[in-house]
């Protein structure tokens, strides 16, 4: 919400009053004097009118989780444990997932209460790299590398996937870099060759890498550099 609209919502202030207070330098947002009425006020913003606190602002929270197998990427599920069940109950409030993983896919998952941040993370236009370690039933050869780089046609959506980079690191394992997120995309890409994915593990999203010190099921807060990378 714009700062001038935020102030105009106060019952004792008119829109004209709000404009004059802003122009006079009476407003501080997160400790900084703001004279621009279009300045954005978020639920996380601390807003002060002179010495009066108008909004304390709730803390923005950002977490990295090493998702284990056997839990769903959801906030609630009637049948299965969810990734939120891995957090203490007092931390679960308002958390949502930025970039889901399938039930038996493991690896990096990001959770936050900051909707704008998670939208930047997952917007299709962001082309943010996602890196996966993949193990398959049948051997992986150069045909896969070439086809993934050219893009594969997905009949259901009638689209061609963006070029992806596949790096074989063993007869039946590879590292795959995607620049988009489609439904079951990795499994469908290997399915183009009738090759079943046996293990799928996400290692990185954008510039955020899974912390090697985190065992499956463990989590930690993101540091400032990781938060600002999105």
UniProtKB/Swiss-Prot annotation:
The active site is at residue 102. It comes from the Bacteria. Its EC number is 5.4.99.19. It catalyses: uridine(516) in 16S rRNA = pseudouridine(516) in 16S rRNA. Keywords: Isomerase, RNA-binding, rRNA processing. GO terms for biological process: enzyme-directed rRNA pseudouridine synthesis. It is an enzyme of class 5 (isomerase). Pfam families: PseudoU_synth_2 (PF00849), S4 (PF01479). One of its GO terms (molecular function) is RNA binding. One of its GO terms (cellular component) is cytosol. Residues 1-68 form the S4 RNA-binding domain. Coiled coil: none annotated. Responsible for synthesis of pseudouridine from uracil-516 in 16S ribosomal RNA. Belongs to the pseudouridine synthase RsuA family. PANTHER family: PSEUDOURIDINE SYNTHASE, PSEUDOURIDINE SYNTHASE FAMILY PROTEIN-RELATED. This is Ribosomal small subunit pseudouridine synthase A. The gene is rsuA.
């Amino acid at each position: 919400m714009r700062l001038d609209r935020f102030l105009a919502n106060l019952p004792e202030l008119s829109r004209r009053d709000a404009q004059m207070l802003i122009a006079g330098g009476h407003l501080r947002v997160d400790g900084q004097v703001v004279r621009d009425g279009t300045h954005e006020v978020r639920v996380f913003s601390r807003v002060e009118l002179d010495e009066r606190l108008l909004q304390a602002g709730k803390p923005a929270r950002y977490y990295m989780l090493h998702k284990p197998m056997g839990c769903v990427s959801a906030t609630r599920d009637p049948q299965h444990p969810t990734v939120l069940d891995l957090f203490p109950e007092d931390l679960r409030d308002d958390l949502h997932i930025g970039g889901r993983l399938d039930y038996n896919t493991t690896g990096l998952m990001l959770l936050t209460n900051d909707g704008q941040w998670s939208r930047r993370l997952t917007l299709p236009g962001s082309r943010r790299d996602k890196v996966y370690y993949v193990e398959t039933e049948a051997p992986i050869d150069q045909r896969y590398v070439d086809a993934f780089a050219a893009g594969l046609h997905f009949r259901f959506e009638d689209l061609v996937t963006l070029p992806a980079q596949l790096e074989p690191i063993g007869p039946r394992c590879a590292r795959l870099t995607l620049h988009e997120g489609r439904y079951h995309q990795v499994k469908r890409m290997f399915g183009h060759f009738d090759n079943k994915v046996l293990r799928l593990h996400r290692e990185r999203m954008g510039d955020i890498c899974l912390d090697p010190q985190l065992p499956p099921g463990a989590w930690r807060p993101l540091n400032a550099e990781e938060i600002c990378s999105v």
